[in-house]
Amino acid sequence: MNQRNMSIINSTPVRVIAIVGCDGSGKSTLTASLVNELAARMPTEHIYLGQSSGRIGEWISQLPVIGAPFGRYLRSKAAHVHEKPSTPPGNITALVIYLLSCWRAYKFRKMLCKSQQGFLLITDRYPQVEVPGFRFDGPQLAKTTGGNGWIKMLRQRELKLYQWMASYLPVLLIRLGIDEQTAFARKPDHQLAALQEKIAVTPQLTFNGAKILELDGRHPADEILQASLRAIHAALS
């Protein structure tokens, strides 16, 4: 086990059903269906645990005057960090990345509070600390090396955020498998290389030993839903 995934695991799983998988695997469809089915039986809510960089980038792009160029700047810098991790990010880029991780941690803390109140949370995505990079819901700055003291401090603080989040195991994690042809057919606006990378990495993640249900995202949606419901009822009983 390398230093990144050395996190203290909380002994009791939280009342969370996490849905993970490559884009195009059917996460959003399954998440919505599970919330609709389970909300009639128990307090159930959905929460998106991605870092929301795309949505935030869209919001920034809509700001008057500086919005569009600044939005393009942030997207290009984020892409640069992913494609050239050996080059340390600049101070502003590192801060933006760190704040995006703080936003994910804020949503995660909100999820924990809801869970303690008796809600069942259905999450689209789940943070992990085994493989760095927002693409895999891991710490983004951990992909980079070097940099000044400010960047090194942000990198360490971000890593601690992900170690903290990864220490909480969901009661069940549903992983949807998919092949690259199907994923690209469903998400033609995504880069094929990015989909291929997610398809290669996601099945290798252990999520700190969480209970994982493996399902084929190419199967009919209702078949996936019913298999998920059976596993959820077993996990909660």
Swiss-Prot record:
The keyword Iron-sulfur does not apply. Keywords: ATP-binding, Nucleotide-binding. GO terms for molecular function: ATP binding. InterPro entries: P-loop_NTPase. ATP binds at residues 21-28. The keyword Cytoplasm does not apply. It comes from the Bacteria. To E.coli YghR and YghT. This is Uncharacterized ATP-binding protein YghS.
